[in-house]
Amino acid sequence: MNTLTTYLVIAAVLFCLGLLGILQRRNLVGMLISLELMLNGANLNFMAFNRFLAPEPAVGQIIALIVMGLAAAEAAIGLSIIFALFRRMHSINVERAQELRG
């Protein structure tokens, strides 16, 4: 049962759930979590293609580690922006954040 198609379907479901979460949420923290879910779906794709199709076994793992590092940096920067927005506006809703436009 462990075929490439199984992993690709699971990765597509993760990515689509993350995309749906970004489009549906109005809370910035929820949107950040949904973005992390999308990145995990992409990581699962890299690992699945590495497992079943890559001649060099370390390439997909290295790419997945790089994406995980970028996701951690994105989460840290995103949370710091959300904290700064909360200090200024006392809310983390997207509608309130759009009031900052000049």
UniProtKB/Swiss-Prot annotation:
It is found in: Cell inner membrane. Belongs to the complex I subunit 4L family. GO terms for biological process: ATP synthesis coupled electron transport. One of its GO terms (cellular component) is NADH dehydrogenase complex. It catalyses: a quinone + NADH + 5 H(+)(in) = a quinol + NAD(+) + 4 H(+)(out). It is a multi-pass membrane protein. NDH-1 is composed of 14 different subunits. Subunits NuoA, H, J, K, L, M, N constitute the membrane sector of the complex. HAMAP family: NDH1_NuoK. Its main location: membrane. Keywords: Cell inner membrane, Cell membrane, Membrane, NAD, Quinone, Translocase, Transmembrane, Transmembrane helix, Transport, Ubiquinone. InterPro entries: NADH_UbQ_OxRdtase_chain4L/K (IPR001133), NUOK/Mnh_C1-like (IPR039428). This is NADH-quinone oxidoreductase subunit K 1. NDH-1 shuttles electrons from NADH, via FMN and iron-sulfur (Fe-S) centers, to quinones in the respiratory chain. The immediate electron acceptor for the enzyme in this species is believed to be ubiquinone. Couples the redox reaction to proton translocation (for every two electrons transferred, four hydrogen ions are translocated across the cytoplasmic membrane), and thus conserves the redox energy in a proton gradient. Pfam families: Oxidored_q2. Its EC number is 7.1.1.-. The chain crosses the membrane at residues 3-23, 29-49, 62-82.
